Amino acid sequence: MWIIPVSANERFIPLELFTGGEIREDTEIKFTKANKIFGEKKRKKIVGPEDWKNPQTGKTIKVYKRTRKGQSGLKTQLFTVTNDGQCIGRVWDSRRGGRIIKNGCKFPLGIWKEGETRSFEGSSGGKPRKIELTILKLGKKQKDKVKFNWKLYDGSGKLMDDNDYTFSAGKAMTKLNDKKISK
């Protein structure tokens, strides 16, 4: 799918760090099998890849399905590789009646540097959104955990969400620091 060369002061972030799958030594982003229950309370699960047909475009793509059991029921999100292999992002979210997401970016993929920030333009439910990812801690090896900041802005540039995430090899997401935004 995507094969990426790595040089000094940067690191390849594999898709398997997001899914909790076994991390390979190569630098290719590919859809490997995932079936992982994770999180402190073991209420989150990621499975895939599976085929999903976008109801707006009719196009079928490979996705991972992530679910979370919560007080308000089951939340389901579908993720795929986006932004020319720079991210894995949501394409669908069950909340608020279900939303199609275009050009989502929820987790960095491929070559990144510690301290690097990248911005991505997309939409959620037809509303324009900007996403900003900043690598906070990277490590040197593909099996090292990754900590990053994820910010979501609305079409006018107002900050809507600001979270720090940590993902660890074989475990998927291991920490979420939700910085409450005053609305």
Q: Where are these predicted regions, by residue range?
A:
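Bacterial N-terminal signal peptides
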Residues: 1-2
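Generic detection of short hydrophobic beta-strand segments and adjacent strand-loop junctions
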Residues: 79, 118-120, 165
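Solvent-exposed helix/loop surface patches that form functional interfaces
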Residues: 93-141
